């Protein structure tokens, strides 16, 4: 084995698969709400020699030698994260959002304690108390949902559930909720019942960082997030607190509580992404993400397709396909046939199973990174509507795919610079 070989020479099979995935990303419209395109700089950091370094512990408090440079990098990542979110404490080591949530649970809860989060079928997340997840197996999970008429949070109902169940922890922040979250109202409810309040802002972190969505830091005891999605970094997790002393308890819950060695190459990539998000043009990007989502939603509404809650305040557009007598499973297949990548998703009060669903979840973060503007997203909406409203028309299917490829050619991914960056 020669460690100096390039990937294409060392393992051509894997190299070919990576190239195939690169081609898929270039020739498809990426509308999965939890995905984005990381910068070349972020990918260079996570593909660096830092992958070789073990660094258990925290900066300046390691269990291994040779950590002087990764200490500098991790401290920079911490400081940038704190500045970005106006927090007084941060841990950048969680491998994922799920790991970040697990560390919070380990710090604040004991098995059997009651936690309260949004029902998964209403837009919650597996790690917020779903019975198939550790959070629903180890804790007594109770759930709140949205109003049946508006599909928005009903704080009177949330308060009633909290008063009745007395949760130890209340979780806000969601995977399929397109409206602004009122963190102050959650704080008031948490204080009334003596609960900790955690915000999981995995989907909206980039919008929060850009001050286009209220910041949960002033209201929540702890905030978790992923570092990809709207934040446009590497796949990873992050924990934040306004109270530095309170935050320190989560350090031990990350290591050694739920993880071993941190991934210093990913932490470097997080630092790069945080640095990018601190630049003024990232705010412009985030503003465009929201503008594009609003145009996408209104275009679909004008074509007779219902949108959950009637629109969006963030990057998520959730289609309720019952309005056109279609399931999410079928819609997902139909758009995939014309090179559009999305995902079937439950909608509030969904009569279908999670394997079928009545919804299709779309997100605008990735294509906005690619340069799509309102005009382009109006065309995206028209293509989706044409495909869904004419599922058996092969001519329209062919035309939709041609229009998708035309858009992809108009907004090239990485502008052809990716090959040069990885040689």
From Swiss-Prot:
The answer to whether UniProt assigns keyword Amino-acid biosynthesis to this entry is: yes
Q: In which pathway does it act?
A: One-carbon metabolism; tetrahydrofolate interconversion; Amino-acid biosynthesis; glycine biosynthesis; glycine from L-serine: step 1/1
Stored CDD domains: SHMT
Matching InterPro entries: PyrdxlP-dep_Trfase, PyrdxlP-dep_Trfase_major, PyrdxlP-dep_Trfase_small, Ser_HO-MeTrfase, Ser_HO-MeTrfase-like, Ser_HO-MeTrfase_PLP_BS, SHMT-like_dom
What is catalysed by this protein? (6R)-5,10-methylene-5,6,7,8-tetrahydrofolate + glycine + H2O = (6S)-5,6,7,8-tetrahydrofolate + L-serine
One example GO MF annotation: glycine hydroxymethyltransferase activity
Its keywords, alphabetically, are: Amino-acid biosynthesis, Cytoplasm, One-carbon metabolism, Pyridoxal phosphate, Transferase
**N6-(pyridoxal phosphate)lysine PTM sites in chain numbering:** 229
Record note on quaternary structure: Homodimer.
The entry assigns this protein to a family as follows: Belongs to the SHMT family.
The identity of this protein, by name, is: Serine hydroxymethyltransferase
What is the protein's species of origin? Prochlorococcus marinus (strain MIT 9215)
């Amino acid at each position: 084995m020669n460690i100096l070989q390039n990937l294409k020479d060392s393992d051509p099979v894997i190299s070919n698969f990576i190239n195939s995935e690169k081609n898929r990303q270039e020739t498809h419209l990426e509308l999965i709400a939890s995905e984005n395109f990381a910068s070349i700089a972020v990918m260079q950091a996570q593909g660096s020699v830092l992958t070789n370094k073990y660094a258990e512990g925290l900066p300046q408090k390691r269990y291994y030698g040779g950590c002087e440079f990764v200490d500098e990098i991790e401290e920079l990542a911490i400081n940038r994260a704190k500045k970005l979110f106006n927090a007084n404490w941060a841990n950048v080591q969680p491998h994922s959002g799920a790991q970040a949530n697990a560390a919070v649970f380990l710090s604040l809860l004991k098995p059997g304690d009651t936690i309260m989060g949004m029902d998964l079928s209403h837009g919650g997340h597996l790690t917020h108390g779903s019975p198939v997840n550790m959070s629903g197996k180890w804790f007594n999970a109770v759930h709140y949902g949205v109003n049946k008429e508006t599909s928005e949070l009903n704080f009177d109902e949330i308060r009633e559930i909290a008063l009745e169940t007395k949760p130890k922890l209340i979780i806000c922040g969601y995977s399929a909720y397109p409206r602004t979250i009122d963190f102050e109202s959650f704080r008031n409810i948490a204080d009334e019942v003596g609960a900790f309040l955690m915000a999981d802002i995995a989907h909206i972190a980039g919008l929060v960082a850009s001050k286009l969505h209220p910041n949960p830091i002033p209201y929540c005891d702890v905030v978790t997030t992923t570092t990809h999605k709207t934040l446009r970094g590497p796949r990873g997790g992050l924990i934040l607190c306004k109270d530095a002393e309170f935050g320190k308890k989560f350090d031990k819950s990350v290591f050694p509580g739920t993880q071993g060695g941190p991934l210093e190459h990913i932490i470097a990539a997080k630092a790069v992404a945080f640095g990018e998000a601190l630049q003024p043009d990232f705010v412009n990007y985030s503003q465009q993400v929201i503008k594009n989502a609003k145009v996408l939603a209104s275009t679909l509404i004008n074509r007779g397709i219902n949108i959950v809650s009637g629109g969006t305040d963030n990057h998520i557009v959730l289609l309720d396909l019952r309005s056109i007598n279609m399931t999410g499973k079928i819609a997902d297949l139909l758009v995939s046939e014309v090179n559009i990548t999305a995902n079937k998703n439950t909608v509030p009060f969904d009569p279908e199973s999670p394997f079928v669903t009545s919804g299709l979840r779309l997100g605008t973060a990735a294509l906005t990174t690619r340069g799509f503007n309102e005009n382009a997203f109006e065309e995206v909406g028209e293509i989706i509507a044409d495909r869904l409203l004419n599922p058996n028309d092969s001519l329209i299917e062919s035309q939709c795919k041609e229009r998708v490829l035309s858009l992809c050619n108009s907004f090239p991914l990485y502008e052809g610079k990716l090959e040069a960056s990885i040689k």
